[in-house]
Structure formats: C-alpha cells, structure tokens
Design a protein with these regions (language model features):
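N-terminal amphipathic alpha-helix/helix-capping segment at the start of soluble metabolic enzymes
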Residues: 1-10, 87-91, 112-113, 117-129
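Structured beta-strand/loop patches that form or line metal/cofactor-binding pockets in enzymes
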Residues: 1-55
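Short acidic, gly/pro-rich beta-turn/loop elements at beta-sheet edges
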Residues: 16, 44-46, 55-57, 142-144, ...
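Conserved active-site and cofactor/substrate-binding residues in soluble primary-metabolism enzymes
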Residues: 29, 62, 66, 81, ...
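Short glycine-/small-residue-rich flexible loop motifs, especially phosphate/cofactor-binding loops
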Residues: 33, 109, 149
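Metal- or metallocofactor-binding catalytic centers and their adjacent structured scaffolds
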Residues: 36-37, 42-114
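Metal-dependent enolase-superfamily TIM-barrel catalytic cores that perform enediolate-based chemistry
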Residues: 121-202
Length: 202
C-alpha cells in the first residue's frame, strides 16, 4: 500500500471530573489521532500520553511534533507492505513509543480495510468482542471509593483499575476487595513510588 496522505489531530477531551493520579490532576485527556491514507482508504490510530512528561518522557504535543516532522515524512509516498517494514522505517527515531504506536495502529487498521477482514480476525483473534474495564481516579474517602466501584460493576464492568498515590491507603484497597471479592482489580501507581517503597507492597 502506497501511503499518499497522513492526517494528524492533536485534541483535548474535557473530562466530567478531574482525572487524579499520582502525578497530578488533569482537566482534559489529550490524544494524538493519526490517519494513514492509501488506495482511497484511511486507517486510524491513537495515542494518549500525558500532556506533560510526568510518568515517562513522552507527552502529547511532543508526539504530535514527531508525527508531523519525523514519522509522517518518513512514510509518505512509501509503499509499506508489513508492520515490520513500518517499524524499520521508524528505527532512526529513538524511543517515542507512544507516537510510533499511533502509526502502527493506523497501519493495521488500514491493512485490515484493504484486506476486507476485521482486524481482530486478521491478527489471530477468535472473538469479535472483548471485555473492557473501568478506571477510577484517586479517591481519599473509602466510602466514595466503594460507591464508585459499585457503580462500575452495575454498569457491567468486570474489571476495575484504581489510580493510587501516596494519599491513598492499602486499607482502602482491602476494603474494596472485601466488598467485591470476585472483582478483577488493577492498581495503577503511575510511577508514584520507587524501590525505596518496596516494603509497602510486600
């Protein structure tokens, strides 16, 4: 497929409530959308690093600039027949896996459309549906945390990821587990702890 056009959008989605994590509060979720066009088709990909490099070195504006000035020009007018070839073309750019992943996802979407095959089937999946989870921002009140978890379960989520920082307590997580013993739980600290805190997690 010869890449004839690339579409880039840096967007900010306002949130209903601030997104509280170990590295701070966000009023918006910023994303980079990448569209790769070939043969009259467009494949879409997205990445959503933080608006500033809080928990790793990437951030949304940086991903946009690299996409515009580096990754995009590298593949425009190129005939790309595999994801490995795409990866190889990007090899001179160090790191920046968020930005690269948006192009990779867009290429796979484009390839699936070209092949007229659902992407899940193209990459070896055997089920067109997957379970999704809910995310709950940092909470400092255990009752509110349990209420938010109950709301997620009532909406049909069988998996919940909890944002966690130093203002939270492990007793709160224990209270959630005791209230919902069958819930699949994930705790996301967003690089808010170091190896010096290892004993907290034992």
């Amino acid at each position: 497929m010869k890449i004839t056009k690339i579409h880039l959008f840096h967007v900010a989605m306002p949130l209903i409530e601030p997104w509280v994590t170990a590295y701070g509060n966000q009023a918006n979720i910023e994303s980079l959308f990448v569209g790769i066009e070939a043969n009259g088709l467009i494949g879409w990909g997205e990445c959503a690093p933080a608006p500033l490099p809080f928990y790793n070195s990437e951030y949304t504006a940086g991903a946009f600039y690299l996409a515009r000035d580096g990754l995009g020009p590298k593949i425009i007018n190129q005939t790309i027949t595999s994801a490995d070839q795409l990866t190889s073309l990007f090899s001179q750019f160090k790191g920046n896996e968020f930005a690269k992943s948006a192009f990779d996802t867009a290429w796979w979407d484009l390839y699936a459309k070209e092949m007229k095959t659902p992407l899940w089937k193209l990459i070896g999946g055997n089920n067109p549906e997957i379970d999704v989870g809910a995310d709950i921002p940092v909470q400092t009140d255990v009752n509110k945390l349990i209420d938010r978890t109950a709301e997620a379960i009532e909406l049909g989520y069988g998996r919940v990821k909890f944002k966690f920082n130093r203002q939270c307590s492990f007793q709160m997580m224990e209270a959630v587990r005791n209230s919902f013993p069958d819930l699949v739980m994930h705790i996301d600290c967003n690089s808010g702890f170091t190896l010096d805190d290892l004993d907290l997690f034992r």
